[in-house]
Amino acid sequence: MQAGNNGGAKLKNDEFDNLYQKNINRRETETVIRRSIPVQRDLTGKILPNQVAYYEEIEREVTFGATHHILDKDNFDSYIYPTNFEVREYQFNIVQKSLYQNTLCAIPTGMGKTFIASTVMLNFFRWSKNGKIIFTAPTRPLVAQQIKACLGITGIPHDQAAILLDKSRKNREDIWTQKRVFFTTPQVIENDLKRGVLNPKDIICLVFDEAHRATGSYAYTNVVKFIDRFNSSYRILALTATPGTDIASVQEVVNNLNISNIEIRTEESMDIIRYMKKRYKEKIEIGLTTEIEMIIEQLGIAVKPVLQQAVELGIYDECHPSQINSFVAMQKSQQIIANPTIAEGIKWRNFFILQLLNHVGQMLKRIKIYGIRSFYGYFRNKFSEFTTKYNMGKSTNKIAASFYYHPILKILMKNCDVYTSNSSFIGHDKLQKIINELSDFFLNSRLDSRVIIFTELRESALEIVKTIDNMGSSSIRPHIFIGQARGKENFDDEGFIRKNKPKGRKKADRLKRLEEDKQKQLSKAKQKEQEKVERSSRRTGSSEEAQISGMNQKQQKEVISKFKNGDYNVLVCTSIGEEGLDIGEVDMIICFDTTGSPIKNIQRMGRTGRKRDGKILLLFSGNESRKFEKAMEDYYDLQRLIGQNFVEYKKSDRILPSNITPECRKEFIHISAENNELNNMEDSDEVIRYATQCMLGKVPKSKKSKAKAAKEPKGKSKTFFMPDNVETGIVSAIALVNKKKSNSNESETVIKTECFPNLDDIEKDMLASLSSPVKPEVDDYKDGTFQKTDRFEEKITGSNLKDMLMSFSKRDEESKVTSFSSDGNYVNEPFGNISLGEKLDINDDFASTPIVKADMNIGQYDRSLIENNSRGGVLFKNAFEKEEGLLKKSEKVYFRDHYSIDNTVVIEPIPNFKRYNKSCLINHNPQVENILNLFKGINENKTQITIEMNRSRCIARGIEKGSIQLTGSDFSLANVMVAQKNNEADIVWDTSKTNKNSHENLNELLDSDSDF
């Protein structure tokens, strides 16, 4: 395909699909059929304009080629059906269809969904040589159930299985590579697919538990979408008891999971009814007490003016005050806020009216369904919050004020205070019914019987626990079972008043307020601690504490364990107990409230009747019975629609060759000792821990493997999974254009210029290097001359200029120095023969830093000493041996022979106090003495000091302009001589190498006392 001038030809959707190759063996052909339709014509027979003479029918046919998985030809001629348990016809039929199609298995709870999944996983494990089989569930207990079923029933080798539940990613890539059967959560799969740790093309079987969650952007949906980009040849098995609430939600699950077939069974299905344990449903309608009816009437009187105003404004339908619905009021308030055509003032007035109706609707719901205690706790919190804000002027909502300040509510609150102050008061007849049912049940039931009570509200769950505990029966032991979130705290009116009251401007007022806040916090903390101690002394203390702070996973596991062991025999649950609780000893379920969701109702009722017959007690009050019947009716209609093929399925790959039809082999599976151990475990965490140990124990790591692993880099590069026949990597721009050969004869010239620092910078750093004596440094010595290095270029600065010109270290008298003779040759002369008055000529290459000494006798190290010692050792190091310091041994010997202890400073990191233990005053060295004299003269404004400073500046400018040159291996000046007068080093000009004009100008500068 060639690009034109318009920027390139456009690709059609099918061409994009072919280029992308998102499906390995999936092919989709589209057929468009046009069918004519009647149209209007004029008198001449022509079709009138703007009419379509036909409509299009689009037919899509999906075909699959050979799978890319490596199949085991010795095994795919048969499939195994375990006979370790009773062979059930519905399970056998579902397994047979699930092997060839992506299946949604919707059967009642306790009917063996895990056995079906394990059988399918076992056969795909046999059919493929390296395909990955993954089971995923949203919670750890559900994963543990499948581990028991898969390893403890079907006999899949435990050394081929892996459990991926922890957040740690250590060795995750190796586990995905080495193992074949995996038990994990969908979030782990999604993250590892995105990180490139798991190759989507390796997956051959994927099992989803609680598949009704595969809606929206849940992890189930994201996993399938990601795999479909690279792999279409894999089997999906979706397990659930309730596929959805309506046909639309079921269709969404089918689309998201690529379902080709739905196997749905109900409790009335012919092939399942004989395996179902009997569940006796008892529906009891509970009436309202006189106290509740009185409170409802009082609320209606207080809210009636607001309701009439809402009806007159047309924002709420007319109804009796006792029938106000909180959900309807909330929906209408959201519609008003989202409507931009309404004026702001009218919009917020209507919003506050509906907000109040929403709160009143919540109050009515609580008092009708849960009782007076639950209602009054909610009412008291709302009343305290509004009145506190309104009295302080923080709220001006007069609509709500007309309700909360209604006189009849004072009577209501007074009566409720009397009711709730009595611990034995029963706020709803549902609670009395629970007491009666539990008394009769445990009187006639087995010793190992258990009861689960479901309610939606935490405060209602705690009230049920306290009510049962007040019975005083030792045979009934209740406990709460809720989620991890902390309980919502009530409105703190004292804290709000203290925070928003006028603050004094004085410091004393602020300190007083801070002290009051501190005292309030301390008293509040003491009160909470005291309440906690009081709770711990009661039988329901752990339930009360859980209602306040929530229950973490450890506490939840402990409660379930005690419930199974019999420490508790009544469990009061919120929605957290609707899924995953597989306790066969539960003989009765009590639904304290009901919901409009058939999924929740069925999940609740499915907690009993698993190992033996059970009883379901449904308590209704208000409109709950009508809501329950409507939800169940919709559920049965949904099952009927699914059975009548009202769902559009997606075609899936058969995976096995079309000419192969495996035969069923019903076999008794012999379970290994390790796998059989799982069948004796009840705790889900114990199952996961044991399976993990088996997985890790079969892969011992030898010492050699550890050594090899240590050499490997810690961070492995991310793997990007791409479709087949795709050019990977980054293509550089130069690879996309025509290359031009360059002329190889062309030469490149690099000009290097030396840059000297500005004099201003030199002057600032004048005294930077005049510190304690330092070790002389030399550069590499080659062919009898010192070679110039970059290090020297950095050292020619004004900070050490005076040292270079005026200071030299004390040397051996027998040492020699290399100088130029008259004929230009090198001459080695003893250093002692050179006087300060002589002219010293050296090259630009400066190799050492001279040091000033008081006697100014010039000496130098022998060259062999420089070559052997100056570069031979490391100047700086982290550790020093005993009797070792910054100086080398030869240097220590030299300084010990030529300098007395009184005139030297120990510069070793660790002073040798054993040798130099005499305390005395140490004189300043000449450099420090010169610095002190220099600053002393500056403070006293001495003219001679100013002239000396200007003299140094002149020398620096001479070096910059070239009047002074640095040449040779030893230090000398081209036109400057060093002389000694009165033990002071003076600089004189050598007139033989400068012209007269420059000599006169320089003398004028040197003799002047100007400050430039």
UniProtKB/Swiss-Prot annotation:
The keyword Transmembrane helix does not apply. ATP binds at residues 107-114. CDD domains: DEXDc_FANCM, FANCM_ID. Keywords: ATP-binding, DNA damage, DNA repair, DNA-binding, Helicase, Hydrolase, Nucleotide-binding, Nucleus. ATP-dependent DNA helicase involved in DNA damage repair by homologous recombination and in genome maintenance. Capable of unwinding D-loops. Plays a role in limiting crossover recombinants during mitotic DNA double-strand break (DSB) repair. Component of a FANCM-MHF complex which promotes gene conversion at blocked replication forks, probably by reversal of the stalled fork. GO terms for biological process: DNA replication, Okazaki fragment processing; donor selection; double-strand break repair via synthesis-dependent strand annealing; interstrand cross-link repair; negative regulation of strand invasion. Interacts with the MHF histone-fold complex to form the FANCM-MHF complex. A motif (DEAH box) lies at residues 209-212. Residues 493-555 are annotated as: Disordered. It catalyses: ATP + H2O = ADP + phosphate + H(+). It is an enzyme of class 3 (hydrolase). Belongs to the DEAD box helicase family. DEAH subfamily. FANCM sub-subfamily. InterPro entries: FANCM/Mph1-like_ID (IPR039686), FANCM_DEXDc (IPR044749), Helicase/UvrB_N (IPR006935), Helicase_ATP-bd (IPR014001), Helicase_C-like (IPR001650), P-loop_NTPase (IPR027417). Residues 94-261 form the Helicase ATP-binding domain. GO terms for cellular component: nucleus. Its main location: nucleus. PANTHER family: FANCONI ANEMIA GROUP M FANCM FAMILY MEMBER, FANCONI ANEMIA GROUP M PROTEIN. SUPFAM superfamilies: P-loop containing nucleoside triphosphate hydrolases. This is ATP-dependent DNA helicase MPH1. Its EC number is 3.6.4.12. Residues 498-510 have a biased composition (Basic residues). It is found in: Nucleus. Residues 430-654 form the Helicase C-terminal domain. Coiled coil: none annotated. The gene is MPH1.
